[in-house]
Every structure is written in C-alpha cells, then in structure tokens.
Amino acid sequence: SYTVRGYQCAESTAADGLTADFVYVENALPVDLLNVKGKIVLVNGFLRVPLYRSLMEAGAAAVVTMDGDIHDDLENTDLHQRKLRSALRTFGNAPAVQLRTVDAMEIVNKGASRAKVTVQNKNITLTSHNVIAEIKGTEHPEQIISFGAHYDSVEFSKGVYDNGAGSVI
C-alpha cells in the first residue's frame, strides 16, 4: 500500500476502488500506449494536455503520476496538490493520483502488473477574491502603478511573498 494524493476534479472510483492491470509507460510515447486500454497507467511526471489527451485516447482506466524526487525528506515534504483542469477534462475524466517518485521506482522495480486505486473526490465551487490596487501618478495622474494578488490560500506557501498566502505587500 502506498500513500497517494488524488488530483482535484478527477473522476472518483467506486467506494471500494478500481482494480485493474497496471503498466508503466514512462513518457507515454505512442508505442507505449498501444496496450493501455482499461489499465491503471503510471507515467513519469505530471499531467499536461498532450500527455493526458494521449492517455484518454488510448483508453487508460486511471492515471498515476510521480511527484518529488528520490531524495525527498519524507518527514518534511508532502505530495503536491494537482488539479485535473478543465482543459484536460475535455479529453475525458478518469481517476488520477500521484505518488512519490521513490514509491513509483519501487513499484516499477518490483514488476507490478496489477494495482488498486481508490479516489473519492467531492467537487465543490467556492468564491475566491482578488486584491487590486492602483496608484495614480502625482505629477502625471494619467499614469498609474497597479498591483494585483489573489487572496485565496495555497499549500506550501512561503507567506506574503506568495500572493496566494492571503497577504498583499
């Protein structure tokens, strides 16, 4: 059993999960995708449009991506939260999770051929706020300096230097 983090907005599995054949396709070249239909597919990296489109067109039942590197300090790092954005979902929606790179290496090295993925997402719509400031020039009032920031929080924020930390400088 491995710790994974589900992609936001990805399809949920049944409550008891999805069990299927498992395959590692590394960078998902066309030749690697010939026999992925109905399988849980592990790819190297995270999801971008060309990769996700190829996986959906090939019929992947679920997608597993890697996060971090083999030297991550497990006590002080966590899996990033990724989102299956609408640009990706236009090609289909499948359960999608990510796991640590070190765990992915172990799974591949063990020659895993079956896997079970359990994802239970609840998609909700919330309101986010932005901060916009405008300073007019004193000598040239037609000239301005403007600032903007989103006022919702993001994980792993470094404080006020990330404009998603709920602070504006």
Where are the regions a protein language model picked out?
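Non-catalytic positions within long, well-ordered alpha-helices that form the structural scaffold/packing
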Residues: 56-59
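Extracytoplasmic/secreted cell-surface and envelope-processing proteins
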Residues: 49-54, 71-78, 155-157
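Short beta-strand-to-loop junctions in surface cap/lid or active-site-entrance loops
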Residues: 28-30, 132-140
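Long, well-ordered, tryptophan-enriched scaffold segments
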Residues: 93-129
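Protein/peptide-recognition domains central to ubiquitin and immune signaling
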Residues: 1, 65-66, 72-83
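Structural recognition of the beta-strand scaffold that forms the well-ordered cores
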Residues: 24, 40-43, 62-65, 96-98, ...
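Alpha-helical metal-binding/catalytic segments enriched in His/Glu/Asp
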Residues: 45-46, 131, 143, 147-169
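Noncatalytic luminal/extracellular "stalk/propeptide" segments of secretory-pathway proteins
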Residues: 1-37
